[in-house]
């Protein structure tokens, strides 16, 4: 057995999983019988994949074909990554050793990263961290998944996940599962500090005791209060260090929160365990007091917020969740409820100009979304199985298209056509004169955005716990 990218081989070799590949791509041979002229060539490609190549090599080749003949952007890698998600899920269901699954997953993600670097692509188009988190649903072992993620140092920063969360003090962003407030303005760099105590004027420690005694000497109505002196000291320190975000495990001072909201400084109180994990990952100290902060205690993150999905939740005093979906390119700012969001996704998926043909898979995806929302508007727990199934079906058809693309490239067809399989019984080719021809890039963008919205909604149940209903007296 050969090792995977230099790692020691563990009991199973990926090349032994040819039945898995065959199950994912067997439909391609039946579909391609529509054109007898190319059936034998495509069958040779499929059989060559099954006999000579591993899953990893097949995925890598698909990525290469996609980038060469389709796009040079991160969406190609994202598609291949999500496709691998379905393969990993099948591996786990077959009872394969989880260690092997994680090694294979890490190998594919690393290959995707290599391709991204080779084509000088930015990371915001591919949420590799979210991909690995999604794979954890299949592996059911976060420690193993973390090993796969840990090597991707350039793709595991705080900028990977952005979820807008409404709180009583100020809005906040979810960065990799950590709640951080924001005024909504975009900054090129985030400078974050972590505190393990309260952030208020009555937090008793050396340095603030003397201020209280001095304040009592001044004439009433003219003497600055203890909180004012403390606020002046803290704001001066924040300005000197150019702090943009504060994570604190204790209480928040309302005056400081107001000051931060007016000056575009993020501030939020969250769990101590969450801050400890973030502090450990970023290799910075958790400070007891803000005035003890130095430049080396600040986490600096470069933000590349382009075409992101943002989600706004308003749980306090309400019985529903509000979604805010924003994008620099395609989606303008809009504040809508979960039900309305699902309706919009479903409408987009049913648009014949975007999704010609039946669009069976996409329709099932939107119906699943609607069904889940009807069951529980607050979305405390989402089941990922159905969404994963439909996403895997789409990816399966997409990879079948890639195999045909490779055949066209081999036959020196310079006029490579846009195409995609809309269902398992028909083959759609581009018809420039038609108003509803199937443009693969548009279709891929539509379902990928719908799937990303679903993934964000799944993450909400983990990051945000809605307030419990009032107890009946």
Task: Describe these PLM feature segments.
Residues 328-473:
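Extended, low-charge hydrophobic alpha-helical regions
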Residues 82, 96, 106, 198-200, ...:
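Short, ordered loop/turn segments at secondary-structure junctions
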Residues 90-138, 294, 298-310, 322, ...:
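A structural-propensity feature for long, helix-poor, extended segments
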Residues 268-335:
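Conserved phosphate-handling catalytic cores of large alpha/beta enzymes
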Residues 1-10, 17, 65-198, 202, ...:
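Non-catalytic interaction/clamp surfaces of large macromolecular machines
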Residues 191-270:
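Extracellular/luminal Protease-associated
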Residues 1-66, 250-251, 255, 262-267:
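Generic N-terminal targeting/processing segments that precede catalytic cores or assembly contacts
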Residues 25-33, 73, 99, 118-127, ...:
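Flexible, glycine/charged-enriched surface loops at secondary-structure junctions
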């Amino acid at each position: 057995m050969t090792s995977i990218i230099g790692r020691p081989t563990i009991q199973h070799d990926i090349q032994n999983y040819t039945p898995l590949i065959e199950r994912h791509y067997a439909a391609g041979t039946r579909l391609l019988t529509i054109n007898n002229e190319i059936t034998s060539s495509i069958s040779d490609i499929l059989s060559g994949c099954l006999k000579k190549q591993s899953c990893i090599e097949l995925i890598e080749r698909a990525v290469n074909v996609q980038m060469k003949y389709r796009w040079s952007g991160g969406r190609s890698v994202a598609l291949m990554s999500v496709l691998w998600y379905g393969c990993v899920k099948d591996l786990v269901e077959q009872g394969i050793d989880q260690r092997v699954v994680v090694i294979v997953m890490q190998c594919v993600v690393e290959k995707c990263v290599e391709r991204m670097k080779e084509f000088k692509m930015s990371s915001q188009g591919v949420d590799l961290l979210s991909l690995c988190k999604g794979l954890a649903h299949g592996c059911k072992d976060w420690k193993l998944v973390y090993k796969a993620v840990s090597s991707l140092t350039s793709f595991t920063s705080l900028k990977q996940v952005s979820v807008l969360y409404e709180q009583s003090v100020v809005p906040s962003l979810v960065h990799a599962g950590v709640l951080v407030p924001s005024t909504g303005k975009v900054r090129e760099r985030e400078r974050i500090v972590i505190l393990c105590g309260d952030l208020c004027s009555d937090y008793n420690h050396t340095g603030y005791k003397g201020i209280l005694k001095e304040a009592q000497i001044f004439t009433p109505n003219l003497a600055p209060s203890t909180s004012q002196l403390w606020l002046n000291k803290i704001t001066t320190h924040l300005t000197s260090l150019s702090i943009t975000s504060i994570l604190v495990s204790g209480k928040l001072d309302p005056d400081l929160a107001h000051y931060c909201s007016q000056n575009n400084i993020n501030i939020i109180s969250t769990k101590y365990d969450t801050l400890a994990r973030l502090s450990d990952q970023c290799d910075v100290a958790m400070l007891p007091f803000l005035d003890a902060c130095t430049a080396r205690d600040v986490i600096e993150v470069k933000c590349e917020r382009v075409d992101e999905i943002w989600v706004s939740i308003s749980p306090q005093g309400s019985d529903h969740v509000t979604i805010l979906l924003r994008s620099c390119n395609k989606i303008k700012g809009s504040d809508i409820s979960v039900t309305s969001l699902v309706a919009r996704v479903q409408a987009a998926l049913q648009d014949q100009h975007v999704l010609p043909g039946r669009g069976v898979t996409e329709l099932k995806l939107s119906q699943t979304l609607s069904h889940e929302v009807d069951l529980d508007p607050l979305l405390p727990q989402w089941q990922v199985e159905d969404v994963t199934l439909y996403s895997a079906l789409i990816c399966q058809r997409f990879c079948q298209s890639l195999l045909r693309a490779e055949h066209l490239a081999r036959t020196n067809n310079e006029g490579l056509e846009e195409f995609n399989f809309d269902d398992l019984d028909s083959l759609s080719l581009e018809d420039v004169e038609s108003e509803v021809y199937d443009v693969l890039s548009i279709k891929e963008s539509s379902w990928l955005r719908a799937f990303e919205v679903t993934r964000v909604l799944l993450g909400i149940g983990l990051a945000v716990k809605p307030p419990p209903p009032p107890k009946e007296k």
